[in-house]
Amino acid sequence: FTKKKERPCVFEYVYFARPDSYLKGKCAYEYRKNFGYELAKESDDVGDIVVPVPDSGVPAAIGYSQYKKIGFELGLIRNHYVGRTFIEPKQNIRSFGVKLKLSSNKSSIKNKSIVLIDDSIVRGTTCSKIVKMLYDGGAKEVHVRISSPPIKFPDFYGICLLYTSDAADEYS
């Protein structure tokens, strides 16, 4: 076989690869932390605390928090017995999965202005539910920051996004 140029899916760097995996000689955790650092450079100074969407948003949130010198809090607690919600085939299952998967940590978010960091938005299902969850938990403000560019087109080989109209970018 002829050796072909490697063309990894960008989602390997953003989400799929384990944080301790190496991609092109660099740890995925470091890529993700750097994404948060770069995001912080572009963002306004808002928020009392930085809250990651667990678990994949944690490295970017750490980078963001370190750059902005804003406290890092686990404002969302993940149930590790619930799997990936964005790959479920139906919207109602995805929405229900978010409620099972995450809960707000009220003691760390009450009356706080939150900078919420997630790695990506595929459809927007998770993000909108989480923002509501944080407000219901007592957050004063929620400022969403995403550490990867918007997903605009279908991916027939990787993430479960078959139609352009499903992308969260369609709603912005």
Q: What are the functions of these language-model segments?
A:
Residues 64, 120, 142:
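Hydrophobic, well-ordered secondary-structure elements that form the walls
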Residues 1-46, 83-94:
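Active-site-facing substrate-recognition patch
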Residues 132-162:
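A short, conserved beta-to-alpha structural element at the edge of catalytic cores
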Residues 47-54:
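Short glycine-rich phosphate-binding loop at a beta-alpha junction
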Residues 69-115, 152-159:
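Short, glycine/charge-rich flexible loops or terminal/linker lids adjacent to PRPP-binding catalytic cores
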Residues 113-127:
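Phosphate/diphosphate-binding loops
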Residues 57-61, 79-85, 122-125, 149-154:
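Flexible loop/turn segments at secondary-structure boundaries
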Residues 163-172:
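Single conserved hydrophobic/aromatic residue that forms the stacking wall/gate
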